[in-house]
From Swiss-Prot:
Biased composition (Acidic residues): 328-362
Cell location: Nucleus
Keywords: Nucleus
Gene Ontology CC, one term: Cdc73/Paf1 complex
InterPro entries in the record: Leo1 (IPR007149)
Family to which this protein belongs: Belongs to the LEO1 family.
Protein name, UniProt field: Uncharacterized protein C13E7.08c
Principal location class: nucleus
Region (Disordered): 1-63, 257-306, 320-429
Biased composition (Basic and acidic residues): 1-12, 369-378
Organism in which the protein naturally occurs: Schizosaccharomyces pombe (strain 972 / ATCC 24843)
Nucleus in keyword set: yes
Record Pfam families: Leo1
Length: 429
């Protein structure tokens, strides 16, 4: 039967909540104590029925076994939660059911009803909680004869299945045997003892009944007892630029930086190679020479490596942590200057190559003209001698230009050509 606060106010709640006819059916109305519905007890077996008279006659009499007293204490005799003729079940209470652990008191129930009515005037949602508290709460009390009475019952059907009835609502149950030994004990804290009263054989799990539409309609209100997990709201982010475009630009910028850094490293290696301090010009004969020379070269190489590693670490720390912004700006300036220098050097190399090509063309032509120039020079000298012998003075100054080509060898084995121009003059006296 269901609970009702109006029945309490009219003084009729006891007849509706706990029926007087339930006293005759104690085997089906044993209540839940301390949060669990327990209806089980071990069958008491008397010592007189352990052995028959024939067994006593055939077996030899046992010798007296000495009994040693270990401890003697006086403890209160707590009543077992279930009678010896019933079974005790362990129940898992779901979130849509609740159990009142204290005995039912009409006066206290009426006071709680008045407090709930006052809260209902300020909060309309409080009515759902009141309805859940009234309809889905297991209560118990002590009857006039001292037996336990409850508004909840475990019903066993003809097919062996079980159901839980609370008032007018029916709930399905799932029965499962307990594999591990589980016992109900009474605690005596003063004597530091635990007294075993009974054991559990099976456990129950309660579910809403599929045939009870009224119960199914109450499920939304039943969920109010669950813990509400706070959900995170959706975060809104305003994007002014295309993130994919920014990503591509950043990747392109990193590629340019890496390319410029590699070119700078190659330039440094080339300078070291030209200055004789690079690893490419390492003199392998130093392995067989004095130890001091080998140590000095190793120190130079190690110091260069340490400086390079230190610089790389500083660049990486400034790039990923953002602590060395000034270092990155200086590095960008150095990279920009280096790129400009590289472009100027490339232009100078191109101009030098063009000049060399022009000189080669001029040198090829001057080889042919050299012989004619020598011939003309000899003719001019002969003419001057003739004029001196004949004492004939020319009236004009004759000037002749001749070009000769000289070849000089360079240390690297290449031949460098130079064009020399010679002017032959004759003056009149």
């Amino acid at each position: 039967m269901s609970d009702s606060k109006e029945d309490i106010r009219n003084g009729q709640e006891e007849d509706d909540l706990f029926s007087e006819n339930e006293d005759n059916h104690t085997s089906q109305q044993d209540e839940l104590i301390n949060g669990h519905i327990e209806n089980d007890s071990e069958t008491a077996v008397s010592d007189d029925g352990l052995f028959s008279n024939t067994e006593e006659a055939t077996e030899a009499p046992e010798a007296d076994v000495p009994v040693k007293k270990v401890l003697e204490v006086a403890v209160p005799n707590f009543k077992s939660p279930a009678s010896a003729s019933n079974d005790v079940f362990h129940a898992h209470i779901p979130n849509f059911l609740s159990v009142e652990q204290t005995p039912y008191d009409p006066e206290q129930y009426a006071a709680e009803a008045e407090a709930d009515a006052a809260l209902l005037e300020h909060d309309a949602h409080w009515g759902q909680r009141i309805k859940h508290k009234v309809d889905n709460t297991v209560r118990w009390r002590l009857g006039p004869s001292g037996s336990y009475q409850s508004n909840a019952q475990i019903v066993q059907w003809s097919d062996g299945s079980y159901s839980l009835r609370i008032g007018n609502d029916i709930y399905d149950t799932q029965n499962k045997l307990i594999s591990q030994p589980t016992f109900v004990t009474a605690s005596h804290e003063a004597q530091h003892l635990l007294r075993v009263q009974t054991s559990f054989k099976s456990s129950f799990t309660f579910l809403p009944s599929a045939i009870n539409t009224a119960t199914r309609s109450k499920l939304p209100s039943m969920r109010l007892t669950t813990v509400q997990v706070p959900s995170r709201s959706v975060q809104e982010i305003i994007i002014e630029k295309d993130p994919e475009l920014l990503k591509r630009q950043a990747e392109k910028y990193e590629e340019e930086r890496s390319r410029a850094r590699r070119r700078l490293e190659k330039r440094k290696q080339l300078n070291n190679y030209q200055n004789g301090t690079g690893e490419e010009e390492e003199d392998y004969s130093s392995f067989y020479g004095p130890r001091s020379t080998y140590s000095e070269q190793n120190e130079i190489i190690d110091s260069d490596r340490m400086d390079r590693l230190k610089r790389i670490k500083q660049e990486g720390a400034g790039q990923y942590r953002g602590y060395n912004k000034d270092l990155e700006e200086n590095e960008e300036d150095d990279l920009g200057d280096f790129i400009a220098e590289e472009e100027e050097e490339e232009e100078q190399e191109e101009e030098q190559e063009e000049d060399e090509e022009d000189e080669e063309e001029v040198g090829a032509g001057s080889d042919i003209k050299g012989f004619d120039a020598d011939k003309e020079a000899s003719v001019a000298r002969a003419t001057i001698n003739k004029y001196e012998d004949d004492e004939v003075i020319p009236s004009a100054v004759e000037t002749d230009r001749s070009e000769t080509v000289t070849e000089t060898s360079v240390g690297d084995g290449s031949v460098q050509r130079r064009v020399k121009r010679r002017i032959v003059e004759s003056d009149s006296e």
